[in-house]
Amino acid sequence: MKILVVNCGSSSLKYQLIDMTSEEALAKGLVERIGIEGSILTQKVNGEKYIIEEPMKDHKKAIELVLKALVDKEHGVISDMSEIAAVGHRVVHGGEKYASSVLIDDEVMKALEDCVKLAPLHNPPNIIGINACRELMPKTPMVAVFDTAFHQTLPDYAYMYPLPYELYEQNGIRKYGFHGTSHRYVSSVASDMMGKDLKDLKVITCHLGNGASLCAVKEGKSVETSMGFTPLAGLAMGTRCGDIDPAILLFMERELKMSPDEVDAVINKKSGVLGISGVSSDFRDIEGAAKEGNKRAKLALDVYHYTVRQTIGAYTAVLNGVDAIVFTAGLGENSAASREEILNGLEYLGIKIDAEKNKQRGKQIEISTEDSKVKVFVIPTDEELMIARDTKEITAK
């Protein structure tokens, strides 16, 4: 059984064709600059690149070219489109309606449209991608897998904001959380590595990329997470501010005479470690600058590590203890220095790190010592595989 996994952005599209017998990706691809000049599709099969450069006026044209690349006689991996048993779509926001992945039909599409106000940047391209696939592959079942779904198990006291209740009732303003597919995947792998049932464990998962969030997992369910109503909340990130005093936004509008759009640009695109360091949103650049004595770069890293450490501490209280901590995503998987700094100060939990193991980059490994009371893992995330597994399970029903 082969499943196509699609992740649509506003002008880009990532895809993988996964053979579910071996759970291996037969092809991985990226389409860039959809709807703008210089459109390009890059597909990798067995390490070899295949590139298509031609105008793609919209996502439908992009998906046409994806299918063309997959069945290409020389560079493709399937002989016919009928080999694609189903398509799994990453959808950022499922609102309160969806606590798990769902088979897509017209009713689901209407619900996704209703969620656009909650995710105006992300849901529209997700919807466009689904519509394009449904048009081109009308007989192929499609499944929506939501970033928010895993966090629908948060208790009401964890997701409710202390605002007038009617803002929740009438406008859906509450904590939703994101990166759910990643948190679900790595917590499951951690339990496998420990040889225990996830339902018997207390796990804190740290998805640390340009966007970053933590999740507290208890009895196999998400009970707390750091992102909120939007992916702007929580930790300091690459370009996002994370949690700040909300009155700062009023100050920016009233005293600094900034428009809502200008404020939005500051807190979403000019803040985080980029804002503090003035160097970059790329942690590799900031780490390099800090080593060369750039004080603002060092401060940016210190603030970032502090917000992660602080949140881990809070989540041990939420869970009443912790059995395992997992690092994943770009920084979590690849920066030994960041992992060390984040865990520095959590010795009271009985955490002991093996310095040599911690030097490993981007591979699945336990980095805690044998006598560490809390297991610490680095687990590369695989959201595409999780989407494919859900798609297989739902279409088999």
From Swiss-Prot:
Catalytic activity line of the entry: acetate + ATP = acetyl phosphate + ADP
SUPFAM superfamilies attached to this UniProt entry: Actin-like ATPase domain
Gene3D superfamilies in alphabetical order: 3.30.420.40
Pfam families in the cross-refs: Acetate_kinase
Positions annotated as active site in the UniProt record: 147 (proton donor/acceptor)
Entry EC no(s): 2.7.2.1
Cofactor: Mg(2+); Mn(2+)
Pathway info: Metabolic intermediate biosynthesis; acetyl-CoA biosynthesis; acetyl-CoA from acetate: step 1/2
Disulfide bonds, paired cysteine numbers: none
Residues binding Mg(2+): 7, 383
Task of the protein: Catalyzes the formation of acetyl phosphate from acetate and ATP. Can also catalyze the reverse reaction.
Family to which this protein belongs: Belongs to the acetokinase family.
Name of this protein: Acetate kinase
Source organism (scientific name): Clostridium botulinum (strain Loch Maree / Type A3)
